[in-house]
Amino acid sequence: MSNYPPTVAAQPTTTANPLLQRHQSEQRRRELPKIVETESTSMDITIGQSKQPQFLKSIDELAAFSVAVETFKRQFDDLQKHIESIENAIDSKLESNGVVLAARNNNFHQPMLSPPRNNVSVETTVTVSQPSQEIVPETSNKPEGERICELMCSKGLRKYIYANISDQAKLMEEIPSALKLAKEPAKFVLDCIGKFYLQGRRAFTKESPMSSARQVSLLILESFLLMPDRGKGKVKIESWIKDEAETAAVAWRKRLMTEGGLAAAEKMDARGLLLLVACFGVPSNFRSTDLLDLIRMSGSNEIAGALKRSQFQV
């Protein structure tokens, strides 16, 4: 028996196995946080990368929506101006048939359309409406254009010019003098032209149904240049009115640039912008080539007399 080597001592005992298992378990626990941290970091990177395309997609959608809103605004303005031209045509037709006076007289009775609170209010309405009809003949002695300018009724002046647009020679004699009666001629003129310049170039072609309405705005601007008497100083224009006119001119130029540039503008479109800067001043971002393009495309020889009266360099 002593000749054989002991075999039991050469193999791991059962008491050594728990120590080995504990050592392996501790080693796993030390390695486990590193694995989890790596997985968390990789997840953050993946999430961050997935968010960026969605953010850019939202920006693209917002830009597309902005373009759609601007397109809708232009189309809405075109429709509104078209409706206004129809109203002007109807008023012109009624006036030629002697119906306008009756329509105006009916306006004095509009307060009676609302339900009266008591009998006293009804009697007061009737009392006021009767003498107002007697005042009409007194104001009718003054030319209509002068009366409208004195009241600074921009819509009324546009309608009056539209109704008589076929006789431009008469209007060019009447309107410049009538504008002097306005309390603030510069503000009145700016109110009259509105924001028609934001409409697309098709509204300024001869074939456009809005052509006559555009001519009204151009005639008002030209009349403003001819308003001051020669040698009697400059027209006073408040700084805030100049700022508003400059904003309009910049927006007008921007639209023309997106439609092919000033050198490709329609005649009426170029003339309108040229008259606007001649009336209220040339914005600082206008280049000399811009003015040359406007002069060339606007048929400036037809409005040379008005342009020479400008108090600004054009």
Curated annotation (Swiss-Prot):
Gene Ontology cellular component terms for the protein in this record: nucleus
Biased composition (Low complexity): 1-18
A single GO molecular function term of this UniProt record: protein heterodimerization activity
Record region (Disordered): 1-31
Subcellular location: Nucleus
Family to which the UniProt record says this protein belongs: Belongs to the Frigida family.
Record protein name field: Inactive protein FRIGIDA
Species for this entry: Arabidopsis thaliana
